[in-house]
């Protein structure tokens, strides 16, 4: 504007012609305003309203902006300020009044709040009138809005400093200049820091404390003192009263806002930014500026943060970081049409954020080398970037023009009702309001120009990131910066299938704030930022997305620092899919890797899916893992680590279909045999160190139950009996502290049980059950071989002989093991009354049915016709001599496959074997996925898909149908072979 024009009064200038939506309504609003001016005896305003130029302009504004209409009708003296003064001088006078209000002698906090609200409203309306009239261009409008916010913030800060000094909580060096050396640093961030505030902006603040300043007082109380002052500052500015509010305040850009005080000591802040600062925080700090309080200290901390924000060398590795921020700001690929109505002018495609980000990313990459690129304002930095050759002059001009155009639209949207919204109205009247305030009487014309602007911005923005690698994110925003939920991100997450989108945002922000050991390094957070869209997409496809992602969060929480997990997942999609499968389908496996993250290491071996975990395979790896370890506790801990990892890996093979349920049972059993045997060796060596050896000692472990039949599941206990023998003349061991043989082996067994089942930092090897020993819990935990044979021949119950059919020596002296095998076979071959045997088996099955009825149709073990019936058929047939194979098989399925034809015809045998395999595959998968027995309604969706795969059936309904058919067939066979049909 010219100097002469700048000295002219408001309505003496050329004003933008605005058209009301409804001329009659506009005239009525103007009449109401004139009546209010007469009531308050504002003759100058009444005269002004009688002039056509003023009346036309103001009536249009009163109709278009309900907020300005309400403010002028409530406080018509606002117009009195521009009756005889230029708008510039009128605004300057208001700002001077605001600045002085904080130091008025005797003013109370409530009086200050009233004064600030009234003066702010006056300034707000004047700025809006100047903007709508085009007396101010958009740049001047943002500048004056920033002046207003800075004046209000400064007044409140000065008032609070003087109040705290008067109360003795701080010691100001100069009460006439309370902000000088006060140590209370108030930084303006975002648009406030860049002097680019919009009409209804929040003001983003970060508050630091310079503890070295003399005003601070007690350094141990300063955080509490200044956090209280900061809380009062927020209240003064943003609490709504009868006079409205001054500015909404957002303090969530401070370091880790979920766990830090409102005012943070400078040292703690520097430590955070240097060690845990995130990419988006680097970008945010570009715009930081001291706006109130100790401005000198504020400039000093920004200077100290300069190396963090601005990398010293032109580092193209930083481009990966920039890409990761870009993904968070916009995860869509930009396809499809842009809808004008309902479009987000700030965050939408082609919006203000894309221009700001276009500038900031170039600054982050090049600003360390070129200080002239470190400015905090968007449009001036476009010019600097063009001067340095980082962008073309065409890009500079296009983006600068559209930036101010879009900011203009943003202001009009907000002027309607003074709300911080950036979304163009979708209804006809609302859209027309914005169009008319922009100077377009035809909304269609405005729509066309607005759409063209978006396309210009989108084209430039897309060109900037043409080479950015995509991670297949879902369409929509994915923004997890700061400490506030981005509305677009909430919508995206909901559309992806997340039920509690806000909770998911909070979880992901926790990752980015580095609160877990695995996310404390900047590199880890950068990789995680890159990976987040792919993670969210993968978990969303599990059909229970929230639950799966929370399990992954628990996994992250337990990971140690330094693990390169995120790089591994990024470079290995199969590993990512596997991890997602674990979290969605197998809560038990998820719990295991959460408690023992080291088990995840085994997945890095690409051969695990092709190598079958045989006994020889496991022995070879155990030998290498134990190495030269000789210390008792170290050996046991290594066994625990090895067992946990390989139980997990066997489970993963089952989960992925590399092995079936039968093979998994054999592998779990081989692993248990190996672990129990090595544990016994370690316990024996430790016992011998103190108590020596027993003359002629022989020890063996007898596996019972599912370990004996090589049918262990992921969570099975191990059933064991420890058998021993020694020379008849051995009275005690030969060590430093001798023990009688019986006591020696009891202690050996007790220590073995402790070694296997004691909870430690590395977990538990196995839960141990020794109740199948002679006389059960009443008998000694270690059994002499002669006592064992005598008991089995003379005193054992039928059910104990049934259990003996699965007894298998797994570790010990070879000759002793051979003797045990002979004893067992002799007992099993004893002549029996088959009818009585069948009656005993039936009675026991009925007792189980009474004491442990099946939970539902998915209780594969206890359901009539289920696993117990199959096991009882096999055990009955073994004891009755109806198994034809030699040597005698241990596994239930193998026994069933070798039933004598005269006992069970081939068709029945095939049905029993098929049923057992069907149950085994299902039960192995269920035990792998869940810690406890659970009904179908508790199966995670991913687990249902797993069960369909292991069963080879299309859906759960078909599995249930097949289960019922197998139950019917097996129960009929049980009744015929063991039931009354056997009589």
UniProtKB/Swiss-Prot annotation:
Q: Which GO terms describe its biological process?
A: regulation of glutamine family amino acid metabolic process
The record lists the catalysed reaction(s) as: [glutamine synthetase]-O(4)-(5'-adenylyl)-L-tyrosine + phosphate = [glutamine synthetase]-L-tyrosine + ADP; [glutamine synthetase]-L-tyrosine + ATP = [glutamine synthetase]-O(4)-(5'-adenylyl)-L-tyrosine + diphosphate
Enzyme Commission (EC) number:
2.7.7.89, 2.7.7.42
Q: Name one GO cellular component term.
A: cytosol
Q: Where is this region: Adenylyl transferase?
A: 473-983
Q: Which cofactor does it need?
A: Mg(2+)
Q: Which UniProt keywords apply?
A: ATP-binding, Magnesium, Multifunctional enzyme, Nucleotide-binding, Nucleotidyltransferase, Transferase
Record region (Adenylyl removase)? 1-468
From the UniProt record, which GO molecular function terms apply? Answer: [glutamate-ammonia-ligase] adenylyltransferase activity; [glutamine synthetase]-adenylyl-L-tyrosine phosphorylase activity; ATP binding; magnesium ion binding
User: Pfam families per the record?
Assistant: GlnD_UR_UTase (PF08335), GlnE (PF03710)
Q: What does this protein do?
A: Involved in the regulation of glutamine synthetase GlnA, a key enzyme in the process to assimilate ammonia. When cellular nitrogen levels are high, the C-terminal adenylyl transferase (AT) inactivates GlnA by covalent transfer of an adenylyl group from ATP to specific tyrosine residue of GlnA, thus reducing its activity. Conversely, when nitrogen levels are low, the N-terminal adenylyl removase (AR) activates GlnA by removing the adenylyl group by phosphorolysis, increasing its activity.
Q: Hey, which family's this protein in?
A: Belongs to the GlnE family.
Protein name in the entry? Bifunctional glutamine synthetase adenylyltransferase/adenylyl-removing enzyme
